[in-house]
From Swiss-Prot:
Subunit structure and binding partners: Homotrimer.
Taxonomic placement: Bacteria, Pseudomonadati, Chlamydiota, Chlamydiia, Chlamydiales
UniProt GO molecular function: N-acyltransferase activity
Positions that bind hexadecanoate: D240, Q244
Native species: Chlamydia trachomatis serovar D (strain ATCC VR-885 / DSM 19411 / UW-3/Cx)
Family: Belongs to the transferase hexapeptide repeat family. LpxD subfamily.
Record flagged with keyword Methyltransferase: no
NCBIfam families per record: lipid_A_lpxD, PRK00892.1
Taxonomic superkingdom: Bacteria
Residues the record marks as active site: H247 (proton acceptor)
Name the record gives this protein: UDP-3-O-acylglucosamine N-acyltransferase
Length: 354
């Protein structure tokens, strides 16, 4: 499908979903549900936006099967999916939106590539990028302007390294990895020993950083190498901007770390963990699989059971909810205590009179 306009029926066939409505409706773009016009396809994933369904002018709306049962009587063109509507909408983006190319195909003459480096086929290396000795860049990789691939480091096939990324020496980047601008992978960890004279002496860090397949790393995120063991981000994990991952940390498979979170050294994060924005996790602990940490959670000890945690120190969400409810009741409790104190004073006065 290479054209830019599709009928509702064509899209349903391409997306492998059912549709309700006029199959001949022509669609030529994508838009949010509030802004969509008759030529646009949109989606409903979060029920908070269901209030826009009735007034939406969208030519077609992707919804889940459950949502369709609720809203089928609105007389709209619906594409009905058993998957997340957002995921199906993403496939539409790939149809309608043409990626912006950097305009620098192949290897730019200003790129600096060491004679011992191995560059596979179909690689794009933009202006002023540097590939150091014995580095290996896999096939169909893209290395952005001003990025550095350190000595003895590897970048797996179909990975996309955006401009001004620093991948230090002896770092392993897997296949289909995306690293956003300004990220630094493989810096020395923040490890020091204090001498008898109170001076802080930096410790050499000999470990590597290993980034497995299908990982995404946000802008200005830093992942430090371990002192002896490796720092590892397992397959499929997604890391937001401005995240700090310290030395010898292991992040499990398909986990998500939101902006400004920090993980101290030698901590092990399980699989399918979600770490909220500005959360802080101390070092040398373990986080179980399927843990969700709310924003600004402060984790001071290991979490051994799946669940939702928040607060500082971290505790189960239900406990926080109960505590918040009690805090809300404090003004009323204060009034009741004041009334009781007055009553006690009256009783004491009566007692003294008798």
């Amino acid at each position: 499908m290479s054209q830019s306009t599709y009928s509702l029926e064509q899209l349903a066939d391409f997306l492998k979903v059912e549709f309700q409505g006029n199959g001949a409706t022509l669609l030529s773009g994508v838009e949010e549900i509030e802004e969509a016009k008759t030529a646009h396809i949109t989606f409903l994933d979060n029920e908070k936006y269901a209030k826009h369904l009735k007034s939406s002018e969208a030519g077609a709306i992707i919804i889940s099967r459950t949502q369709f049962q609720k809203y089928r009587d609105l007389n709209k063109n619906f594409l009905i999916t058993s998957e997340s509507p957002s995921l199906v909408f993403q496939k539409c983006l790939e149809l309608f939106i043409t990626p912006v190319d950097s305009g620098f195909p192949g290897i730019h003459p200003t790129a600096v590539i060491h004679p011992t480096a191995i560059i596979e086929d179909h690689v794009c290396i933009e202006p002023y990028a540097v590939v150091c000795q014995h580095a290996h860049v896999g096939s169909a990789c893209h290395i952005g302007s001003g990025s550095v691939i350190g000595a003895y480091s590897t970048v797996g096939e179909h990975s996309y390294i955006h401009p001004r990324v620093v991948i230090r020496e002896r770092v392993s980047i897997g296949k289909r990895v995306i690293i956003q601008p300004g990220a630094v992978i493989g810096s020395c960890g923040f490890g020091y020993v204090t001498s008898a004279f109170g001076q802080h002496k930096h410790l050499k860090h000999l470990g590597k950083v290993i980034i497995e397949d299908d990982v995404e790393i946000g802008a200005n995120t830093t992942i430090d190498r371990g002192r002896f063991k490796h720092s590892v981000v397992r397959e499929g994990s997604k890391i937001d901007n401005l995240v700090q991952i310290a030395h010898q940390v292991e992040v499990g498979q398909h986990s998500m770390i939101v902006a400004q979170a920090g993980i101290a050294g030698s901590t092990k994060i399980g699989n399918h963990v979600i770490i909220g924005g500005q959360a802080g996790i101390t070092g040398h602990i373990c986080i179980a699989d399927h843990v969700i940490m709310m924003a600004q959670t402060g984790v001071t000890k290991s979490i051994t059971s799946p669940g939702i945690y928040g607060g500082a120190p971290a505790r189960p969400y239900q406990e926080i909810h109960r505590q918040v409810a009690k805090v809300r009741n404090l003004p009323r409790l204060e009034e009741r205590i004041a009334a009781l104190e007055k009553l006690v004073q009256k009783l004491e006065a009566l007692s003294e009179q008798h």
